[in-house]
Amino acid sequence: LGISAFNLPHGFCIVDDIVYLTDREDSVCLKYTSDGKPLMVLGERGVHSDIGCEKTGDLVPRAAGPFNYPSEMFPAPSGDLYVSDGYRNSRVHRFTKDGQLIQSWGVPGKEAPGEFHLPHSILIDEEELVYVCDRENSRIQVFTPDGEFITMWTDMTRPNDICQSKDGDFYVAESSFQGSTPGISVRDRQGKVLARWDSRSAHGLWVDSQDNVYLALTGAESVDKYMRRD
């Protein structure tokens, strides 16, 4: 892809051999072929929406349109693109496959459904339900494709990333909070914990077709792999 193409790449994922990621510092979302051919840029490089705050990670005074330090872009089966806009905003944005904004939802907050404090990762399942890692609120919120709140999972600490295995189970990378140990939790479709183990603190994770788990460690600048044992 070329190192000069990015300022701070974030939220990297591959779906159907297409690469999706954000450039957090430049406030753009990017789409590439697997061999690095640019397909789409959402946003204007270096132009950040006005949320009344310039400190990354703080609870922002107000929500705004796309983008201000977006954290991840993920495609839905329909082709729509969803973005968690994240580090200096508190919204989810939904676009057509051609990059036209359909809608946005979310406001800054710490408790109520639809309130976010650093939506850090986003996942769309085969039913087009939207899962948002509301990291600084230590929960995952689940929405319909139109942004209607369904439920939230709260038995976790600072979820950095979420992905889904081929069997439909969800894997969540949880980071430490107030002395807790970072780890990985495996959950069913209702959010019930099926398994949990301690790990190094992962900023991102992915599960392959064999249910092996890969953790991206920003602090250690490395990748850990966990192999499934049947």
Indicate where each model-derived feature is located.
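Short loop/turn segments that connect beta-strands within beta-propeller blades
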Residues: 33-37, 96-100, 144-148, 187-190, ...
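Beta-rich, blade/repeat-based domains predominating
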Residues: 4-18, 51-80, 111-129, 138, ...
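Short loop/turn segments that connect beta-strands within the blades of beta-propeller domains
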Residues: 15-16, 25, 34-35, 77, ...
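Conserved beta-strand positions in repeat-built beta-propeller and related beta-rich domains
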Residues: 21-24, 83-86, 130-135, 170-178, ...
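Beta-propeller domains
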Residues: 82, 86-104, 108-150
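Structural signal for beta-propeller blades
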Residues: 27-30, 90-92, 138-140, 179-184, ...
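A short beta-strand motif characteristic of beta-propeller blades
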Residues: 1-3, 40, 57-63, 103-112, ...
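Blade-level signature of beta-propeller repeat domains, shared across WD40, Kelch, NHL, RCC1
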Residues: 200-230
